[in-house]
Every structure is written in C-alpha cells, then in structure tokens.
Amino acid sequence: MAAYQQEEQMQLPRADAIRSRLIDTFSLIEHLQGLSQAVPRHTIRELLDPSRQKKLVLGDQHQLVRFSIKPQRIEQISHAQRLLSRLHVRCSQRPPLSLWAGWVLECPLFKNFIIFLVFLNTIILMVEIELLESTNTKLWPLKLTLEVAAWFILLIFILEILLKWLSNFSVFWKSAWNVFDFVVTMLSLLPEVVVLVGVTGQSVWLQLLRICRVLRSLKLLAQFRQIQIIILVLVRALKSMTFLLMLLLIFFYIFAVTGVYVFSEYTRSPRQDLEYHVFFSDLPNSLVTVFILFTLDHWYALLQDVWKVPEVSRIFSSIYFILWLLLGSIIFRSIIVAMMVTNFQNIRKELNEEMARREVQLKADMFKRQIIQRRKNMSHEALTSSHSKIEDSSRGASQQRESLDLSEVSEVESNYGATEEDLITSASKTEETLSKKREYQSSSCVSSTSSSYSSSSESRFSESIGRLDWETLVHENLPGLMEMDQDDRVWPRDSLFRYFELLEKLQYNLEERKKLQEFAVQALMNLEDK
C-alpha cells in the first residue's frame, strides 16, 4: 500500500504517457461499443487551474480528462540546488546560513542595489574633491553627510564580501573577479582607517591612500558581465602577443643603451640653446625617449636639436633615428595592431558561432514544440471526428434495427390467423435471430476496432472511417472475417489493461533505479566533501 501511494505521489512523464495511452484506448473502445457518451475535452492543466476548476466540476463530475505530457529540463544547476542535495542540509531541522546568503547574493534587487551604490560612491567622491579646499563653514553639514554616506557604502561593500564568504568560502577565492573585488575593497578601506585613527600629514603615502578611495569605482568590473568579457578579450590578445612584446622590450633596451653612448656628447654639451639635452642623460630617460620616438612624437625636432652639436655625427644620429622608426614605429606597431585586430576578429567569430548555435537550437526546440502541438491537435480532431461518425453510424444502425423489428412484428400480426403453435415458434425464431444479429454486430465492432487500433494510428483510422460508411465496411469485410484463421486473435480487454499496467509499473521501477543511482552518487560526493 505504501509503495502504491509513493507511486501516486511521483509524477513521471513516461508513466503518464502510458496511462494516457491506456485511457485513450479504452475510451475509444467504449465509444465504439456505445458504452460512453463523452470524449476527453479538458487537460490536467485546465482542471488544476483555480479559475476554471469550479466550472468544470459543476459541469460534469464524471467526464474524462486528457493527460498533457511536457517534460521538464534543468538547463543549469545553481549553487543553492547543489547545497540542498547535501546530506547534512537534508538532515538538519533548519536551513543553513550559507543557503540564505546565496539567496541574497542571487537576488536581482540586491545586485541592482550594489550597482547603484557604486555609482553613488563615484558621485560622492566627485563632490568631496570639489569641497576639499573649501573653508566655508556653511558646507560642513554637507561634508559630514558625504562622509557618513561614504562610510555606509563601504560597510555595504564589506557586508557583500562577508555574504560571499558565508555562501562558499573556498569558491570565493577560486574566482579571479572575487579576489579583485576583495583587493579593491580593502585598498579603499585603508584611507578610511587612516582618517579614523587620526593620522595627519602631507606625505606621499597618505596621498596615495587617499587616491585609493577612487578604486571603489572599479567594482563595476565585477558587476557587469559585458565589461568582464571585454577585459578577458584584451587579456587573451595580450597572451597571444607575449613573445612579440618580449622582443619589443629587448629592442627597447638595446636602443636605450645605444642612445646613452651615441648621444653622450650631446648630453654633456655646454650649449644653452639645447631643449632636449637630458633625454639621453641616463638609462631611464633614454627608455622614455625611445618610447616617445616609438609614438612618433616630435622626433624630427629632437633630431634637429641633436644636429646642433657638432661633436655628434649626423650620419650615426640619423641612422639611429631612422632605424628605430622603421623597426619600432612601423614594423612592430603594425604587427601589434594586426595581431590585436586578428584576435578580436577570432573572438568575435567564436561569439557569433556560439550565438548562431544557440539560435539554431532555439529554433529547433520551437519547431519540435510546434510539431508536437500539431500532432496533438490533429489526433484530437481525428478522435472527435471518428467519435461523431461512429455515433452517427450507430444511430443509423439502431434505426435500421428498429425498422427491421417493426417489419417483423407486422409480419407476425398479419399471420395472426395461424395456429398458436406456429405463432410461438415464429416468435421464438424472431427473437433468436434478433439476439444473434445484435451479438454478431457488437462482437464484429469490438474485434474490428481493436485490430484497427493496434495496427494503425488514430489518424489513419479516422481517414478510413471517413471514406467508407460503417455498415458498408462491415458487410464488405464480413466474408474475410468469417474465413480468417482462428489462431489470429486480438487481445482481450483484461490482457490489454494488464499490459498497460505492467508498462506503467516498469517506468516507476526504472525511475526508482535512477534515484538509487543518484543517491549513491550524492553519498560519494558527501564523502569527498568531508
């Protein structure tokens, strides 16, 4: 009994499909036999709808209901669903705090609130910078309000990190964006702590700490997926250019060191009209100068300034500038631009292919749903039309039988003058013939119905009914049915019902086997978690 109740509680698509097939089959048999007068016009979804349930129940409490089978597919398993499948969560009386923290973090309202705070923090920093040097005492309440708002925003950011830790501490540190968010939040917390402690001064470190408050705007990178994709594309492009950048840095170093030696006379020249005499004074300045030449910024003015010193050879200086312009500014920069464009095109092509694949899959799913819905509509229309035609044919047959009975009764009345024994024998013969005809018609109707339903679909059956009249079809196939081999038999109703019942139980057994396998997998996962 418990197993039967458990089977009733479970909702299996395959078992429901078999049960729906059983109901449709026996409903058709009953209609062909004239035992039922109603067809399934409503589905389970319509019956469970509160707005229509009362109306359907008041209309006909004994009407049949058509099952609509729609499988449910889980596209992506969330962290909350994984957490709910854990053994200690299922066995505990109350849900853990990690489940609540994950629900808060996944809430769209909380995400939008964090994004709003990031933009609000940017506006507050802009206003604070404008009011930083102001000595007006009337603006002190505004400054205090901005300071309180900055502290409130910082506390909300810290609370967000604590919720992520509470949700899953190990997964938090595996995500690069979470680590980036943590570093930005902690760096923006340092100037607030310094101000709270009371450290004052104008040192460089304090100024850098104050600048760190601006880093809170970088939290937008961890909030928007589109910005993350752009950054990932840039990182991927830079990875593909690793060796090219290494080669470029080597040439930077070579030309910087060469410039220090080649233009040493220019650097030590006593002329007062030299504008760029410190550009090659040491290695750092030489590296900056090489980078300026790499960008083609006033390179000719620098060359003209070098030519003012007669100790520097014009040939070597010209070769130095032209060679670096050819290698760095023309060749290397063109290669870098070409590689960046190629990488972006490849990434764009991959994204387009992925989007096209998803669109094709979506169109295929929509096409499948349309085909399934069309088949359901066609089968429903064919079934209703066949029922209506069968009812019409049964009515015509009943009228013919009534006319036949009336004619026979009239014949009996006309022969009323016969003897009493002849009358009794004729009445008994007429009753026997009528009963045989009725039994024969009902048996032929059931056998032809079961055989035609098992051999062909409902659509073909409805088409064959539409082409021929029922009485004509029976009379044409009557000799063939009489000459049919006795071994070729159709299933009885009880055997057919038992067959569908066993198929339904088989689906429940398969589902139970599947769940046992899932429990074994979850047990192994719980052992690994411990």
Curated annotation (Swiss-Prot):
User: Can the keyword Transport be found in this entry's annotation?
Assistant: yes
Q: Briefly, what is this protein's role?
A: Pore-forming subunit of the CatSper complex, a sperm-specific voltage-gated calcium channel, that plays a central role in calcium-dependent physiological responses essential for successful fertilization, such as sperm hyperactivation, acrosome reaction and chemotaxis towards the oocyte.
> What's a GO cellular component annotated to this UniProt protein?
plasma membrane
Known regulation of its activity is: The CatSper calcium channel is indirectly activated by extracellular progesterone and prostaglandins following the sequence: progesterone > PGF1-alpha = PGE1 > PGA1 > PGE2 >> PGD2. The CatSper calcium channel is directly inhibited by endocannabinoid 2-arachidonoylglycerol (2AG). Indirect activation by progesterone takes place via the following mechanism: progesterone binds and activates the acylglycerol lipase ABHD2, which in turn mediates hydrolysis of 2AG inhibitor, relieving inhibition of the CatSper channel.
The subcellular location is:
Cell projection, Cilium, Flagellum membrane
Give the UniProt record's GO annotations in the biological process aspect.
calcium ion transport; fertilization; flagellated sperm motility; sperm capacitation
Family per record:
Belongs to the cation channel sperm-associated (TC 1.A.1.19) family.
Q: Which domain of life is it from?
A: Eukaryota
Cytoplasmic face residues: 1-108, 167-175, 223-239, 342-530
Q: How does it assemble?
A: Component of the CatSper complex or CatSpermasome composed of the core pore-forming members CATSPER1, CATSPER2, CATSPER3 and CATSPER4 as well as auxiliary members CATSPERB, CATSPERG, CATSPERD, CATSPERE, CATSPERZ, C2CD6/CATSPERT, TMEM249, TMEM262 and EFCAB9. HSPA1 may be an additional auxiliary complex member. The core complex members CATSPER1, CATSPER2, CATSPER3 and CATSPER4 form a heterotetrameric channel.
Which ranges are annotated Basic and acidic residues under compositional bias?
Answer: 429-440
How is the protein disposed in the membrane?
Multi-pass membrane protein
What is the name of this protein?
A: Cation channel sperm-associated protein 2
Q: Name one GO molecular function term.
A: voltage-gated calcium channel activity
Chain intervals for the UniProt region annotation (Disordered):
378-458
Tissues expressing this chain: Testis-specific.
> In the record, where are the intramembrane regions found?
282-294
What single Pfam family name could you report for this chain, choosing any that match? Ion_trans
* Name of the coding gene: CATSPER2
- Which segments cross the bilayer? 109-131, 141-166, 176-200, 204-222, 240-262, 315-341
List the catalytic activities from the record: Ca(2+)(in) = Ca(2+)(out)
